[in-house]
Amino acid sequence: MIQAYEIAHLIKINDLEKARNIFKKTVENTYKDEFERKSIFKALEIAEQLHYGQYRESGEPYIIHPIMVSLFLAKFQLDFKATIAGLLHDVLEDTNVEKEEIVKEFDEEILSLIDGVTKIHDLHNKTRSIKEANTISKMFFAMTHDIRIIIIKLADKLHNMTTLSYLPKNRQDRIAKDCLSTYVPIAERLGISSLKTYLEDLSFKHLYPKDYKEIKNFLSETKIEREKKLYKGKLSIEKELQKSGIEAEITVRSKHFYSIFRKMQTRTNKLTQIFDTLGIRIICKKQKECYEILEIVHRVWKPIPGRLKDYIASPKENKYQSLHTTVRIPEDNQLIEIQIRTEEMDRIANYGVAAHWIYKEQIELKADDLSFINRIKKWQQESANKSQYSMNDIHKELLNTFIYVYTPEGEVVELPFGSNSIDFAYIIHTDIGDQALYAKINGKISSITKPLKNEQIVEIFTSKDSKPDVIWLNSVRTKKARSKIRSWLNKNDNTIFVDNNIIAYLVGANKEQRKLFSLFKSYTKTKIKRIAIDPECSPTTGEDIIGIIHKDEIIVHNENCQKLKSYKKPQLIEVEWEATPTRKVHHIILLLKELKGIFSYLENIFTLNDVRLISEKIEDCGNGHGITNIIVSSNAKNITKIISALKENPNILQIMQIEEDIKNYDN
C-alpha cells in the first residue's frame, strides 16, 4: 500500500522511461494473477499507441499522465480493471478510439469506468455556476454507481495538479480553487486522507505561494529541534508498551502545510506561535490495546481536559476510527495531539473506500456501505425534478467541511461547517429543536444561533413556551433543521406570511433571493426601555457580547461572564457593537390590515427620519390584507427609528426587513 512519502516522491516524476519502469515494477508486485498483469500491460501498449505524438503543456509526452494516474491506482491496490481504466481514461475524449473497440479488447465493465471518468469534465473547462453544478452532479451520479470512478478521477486530479505551474496564473488559480472547494471535500468524505492531504497542499502552493514557502522553510529549519522535544516522551511510551507486552509502532509526523496555514488564519497570523506542528501516531494490533495505550500516554504526559475524542466508539461518517488525545509536553509547555488506532483503522484512515480492496480479493465495495454515498443518493432523489443544480445547494448539502461536536454524554455529532445549536438540536430530536431556548457551549451560556466550532460540548435547554422563529432559517445549515422549521411555521404562527408566499420568496431556490434573505433581520415586539452594560463584567468594544432581556431592559454581558449562570430562564438576544454608520438599502416588507392612508403615513415618517425612498410597491392580498414592499436608503440608526415607529402602528400586522449594499442602486 502506498505511503505518504511515496506520494511525495511519485508526484515529482516527469521522465517517461522512469515512470514506465516504476509502473511495470509496481504492477508485477501488486497483481499476482498472470491474466491481470498481461491485461494491464496490454492496456499500456494501447494507451502509448493512442497518445503517440501528444504532449502536455509542460512539454512532457502525454502518455506520462495516464501512466502516473494508473501508478497511483496500482499503489492503492485497486483491482486490475480500475488500473486499466486509469491508463485509458482519456482515450475516448482525446483520441479517435471507439467504445466498441474498448469492449472488444477488454470488456463492458472497463468501458463503463472509462466512460464514467470521461463524463466528469474538469470544472475549469466549463462556465461557472449552473454548468459547474451540473458537472459535479454527474460526478456524484457516477460515484453512486461505481466508487472506482471517483477514485480514478481523484488520481487524475492529483497528477494534473503537479503540472499546474505550466499554465497561465489565472488558470492556475481557478483550477486550484476548484480542487480545494470540490475534490478535496470529496476525498475527505470518502476518507482518502492521503489524497486529500496532497490535493490540499498542491492547491495551497498555487493559491498562496508566499505562505506556502514560509511554512515549508519554517518546518524544514525547525524539524530537528521540534522532534527532539518529543523524543524523551516517545522513549518513555515505548518502554511502558514493552512492559505491558503491547506491540505498537510509534511515529512522529509533521502536520501538512495547509492545515498549519488554516490554524494561522483562525488562531494567530504568526507562524512561530503555532506550536502543534507535530503529532504522534501509535499503531497497534487490537482494538482493546488502543485504550490501554491511551492510559499509558496519560501517565507519561498530562492530558488536556476536554480534548479526548473517541472515534472508535463513535466513528466518523467516512468510517474513520481512532482515539485522539491532546497532551502537554512539560519541557516547553507545548501541546501535542496523539492518535491511537489499529492497523486496520490506519488503512481506512489513510485510504478510505480504497482500503476495501486491500487484502479482500474479489470483494466488491457497495456504494451503500458509505453514508456519504447514501446522502448523495437521497439528495439526487429529492432533486429528481430539477433540470439544473445550484453550486450553493451542492456545497451546502454535500461538500462543506464538517465539524464534530459532542453531547454532554460524549456522543459525537457531525454537522456541516457553520452549523449552530439549532442544527444540533434538530439532529438530536425534532421536539428539542422546536422548543430550543438557549444552549450551553462547554458549560457557558450561548445564543442558539451562534455558529459552533470543532470539539465543543453542546447542551440544549428547552421550554414549552419556546417555538421556532422564521429568523432561524437565516442561520441554520442542515437540511433537516430548515425542513422542520418550515414545517412548524406552516402549521403555526406565520400562516399569513406562508399563505402569501413571502417565506417562499425569502428562502426560495433563486440565488438572488437567497442573497437577500441572508441579510434578513427580525425585530422583537418586546418594548425595551433601557439598554445597559453589566457593571461587573463590563465588556469593552470588540469583545464577544450577549444580551439578556430582563423585564423591560437589555443587559449586555461579556459572553464569558459567570453572572449569566444565575439566570434560570434567560431570554438571550444576539447583540453586537454598532459599526460606523453607513447608508444601506433596506427592503421593508409590511403586512397591513388595510391599504387606506398608507402612502401618506410612510412618506411622513421617512421625511422625519432622513430616509430616502427609492421605490414602493403595494399589493392587495385579496383577503382583506395588503402587502407593501418598500425600498429605502439610510443608515442603521435611522432605520431602527423607523422600525420602532412602524411597530406602534396598529394597521401593521408584521414587519420584515432585508438589507442590501447601496452600490447596487446608485447610478
Curated annotation (Swiss-Prot):
Presence of keyword Manganese: yes
Keywords of the record: Hydrolase, Manganese
Catalytic reaction list: guanosine 3',5'-bis(diphosphate) + H2O = GDP + diphosphate + H(+)
An example Gene Ontology molecular-function term: guanosine-3',5'-bis(diphosphate) 3'-diphosphatase activity
UniProt-listed GO biological process terms: guanosine tetraphosphate biosynthetic process
CDD domains: HDc, NT_Rel-Spo_like, TGS_RSH
Role played: In eubacteria ppGpp (guanosine 3'-diphosphate 5'-diphosphate) is a mediator of the stringent response that coordinates a variety of cellular activities in response to changes in nutritional abundance. This enzyme catalyzes the degradation of ppGpp into GDP. It may also be capable of catalyzing the synthesis of ppGpp.
Record family assignment: Belongs to the RelA/SpoT family.
Name the record gives this protein: Guanosine-3',5'-bis(diphosphate) 3'-pyrophosphohydrolase
